[in-house]
């Protein structure tokens, strides 16, 4: 039982937190906050030196203020090398590095890292999904890693 709890806590630690970068208003709302586009930074928790920037719509108004609104599924991602890229441990070929709820219960936005071993490149995909059905809307970006630093892969 203790092992399961430790694994669950470790898994939560791997899902990085987002840091707000900025926002712009898109629609004025007389009551409650305006509709916005928000930009958040997400540091990859297992790849030092890579940060992903995600922009997405955030619903305002009364429902938005109360946390009852469902944000749109569209998002855009741009990941960049912000320092020397290092790996503490081998990476799986594909791994979710971040997820955040964007509606009260049903919808999440996700960032998944994939390793393109042939090109020594990290590929990041963002999309949203629901409990039953996701959205085909997505955005992808890639961060090439210097050939002198091969990406270590785990057996997963």
Can you describe what each PLM-predicted range is?
Residues 15-16:
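C-terminal motif of bacterial Sec signal peptides marking the signal peptidase cleavage site
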Residues 20-29, 59, 76, 82, ...:
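Local beta-strand/beta-hairpin segments that build beta-sheet-rich folds
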Residues 119-156:
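C-terminal partner/receptor-binding element of secreted or periplasmic proteins
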Residues 37-41, 50-52, 111-113, 121-126:
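Broad, structure-driven detector of short, well-ordered beta-strand segments within folded domains
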Residues 1-4:
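Positively charged n-region of N-terminal signal peptides that target proteins for export
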Residues 51-117:
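Mature extracytoplasmic domains of secretory-pathway proteins
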Residues 19-61:
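N-terminal export/targeting and maturation segments
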